Amino acid sequence: MAKSLRFIQCGDLHLGSPFHNLAAIDERWQRIVGKAPVRAFQKIVQMAIDKRVHAVLITGDVYTSADHNLTAQLDYVRLLHKLAQNNIQVFAVLGNHDPLEAWKAKIPFPPNVHIFPTESVERVPLVVDGEEVAAIYGQSYAKSEQRENLAWKFNRAAGDRFSIGMLHTQVGSRESTYAPCTLEDLKECGMDYWALGHIHKHEILCEKPYIVYAGNPQGLDCTETGPRGCYYVEVGPYGTTDLEFIDTSIVRWESIDLAIDGIESVSELRESVRFAKEKVRRDIGKPTFLTVNFTGSGSMYHVLNNPEATQYWLDSWREEEQGKYAFVMVERLRNLARPKMNLGERSKLPDSVGDYLNVFDKLEKLAPEEKVKALRDILMSRPEFERLGTYGRALTDERLLETFEKAKWLGVQKLLEHRRG
């Protein structure tokens, strides 16, 4: 390559996505945090200008739903115009949340924006100062479901200096409805760089060639913890490629584990949470919604199972954060701890608690796959299962095993309370 190339890869912007838990923060921060996805994209646009990139690649799911709201579209186009004013080209593919069939408002894009078609893979030259420095390939979704393996349709043209493939896809599964493909499918296409969308966690799947998920620029709920952002990429004159992940999140979602071992009073427990909050504030330095997972074993287990007490703590901790810039809002508490008890010895006693533990022990001795199957069979055989609806059908193996463990200890607690009563 005679010239170097600079670009930003981002995707899964989800502009207009509702941001939950805003009732817990004051009005000033509701206005700021409420538009966090848009503000995260604003940071990307400003970064593109500051770094004088040649292109911004957007790998699908600009919006959250098929009827993407008008305000989100206006915000998006306004920021695209800002890139146009700085001579930065934009290349975008449409994903499952913003397929071609879902585009309703006729808001024209500036001339610097190229949307890849849905019918076939298109090759578009990236020209800098009159010289083609790269070729960009892409294909968009026509509908929200795309069962075809689109990766098979990509082929590098002879003579490309540097080839970039853009695709909204789920790598690693041929059964997905999101343009499923494998890592080998992508490698065989001859691209020098793959800019992928759909997965919200940033990850480099391969370095030869680079196959990259940028993730989303802003976490949307408590499952999307950690830094969120985009990749800034520099390609040297001879094709050497350097990547830098840059955090663009306006607000963070975080999760911490807090062991209750050795904690013997409610005041100690509350102080431990307060100390953990301050550490998160120092480390992150921006508004944060925090999940606290209580682990270990101790006398505070029973207190943590009291919903009135935990709700009171949540309310008081939230009140402490009002008016703070880098607030750390404890969004939820999860009791993954255990009471102080030797289950092996307790199960030997000839009573209802011992019998209960022996039944659980038989399940726990199963291999993980067998245990999950047994638990699902038990769950699905119950008439109440249908009432769970989509939640029940979406229950992951991990969540099922976690619930099983929690149920064991809750059952022991209830049986012991009944015996004392």
Each predicted region: which residue ranges?
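N-terminal active-site segment of His-dependent metallophosphoesterases
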Residues: M1-Q73, R393, D397-E398
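Structural signal for conserved beta-strand scaffold positions within catalytic alpha/beta enzyme cores
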Residues: Q9, P117, G138, Y213, ...
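Short loop/turn motifs at secondary-structure junctions
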Residues: S4, R52, E132, G190, ...
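Hydrophobic pocket-lining residues that define ligand/cofactor binding sites across diverse proteins
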Residues: A48, L83, V280
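Accessory, non-catalytic peripheral segments of nucleic-acid enzymes
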Residues: T248-G421
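Domain-start "cap" segments at the beginnings of catalytic or binding domains
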Residues: M1-W29, R228, E234-A259
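His/Asp/Glu-rich metal-coordinating catalytic cores
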Residues: H20, D26, A55, A66-D242
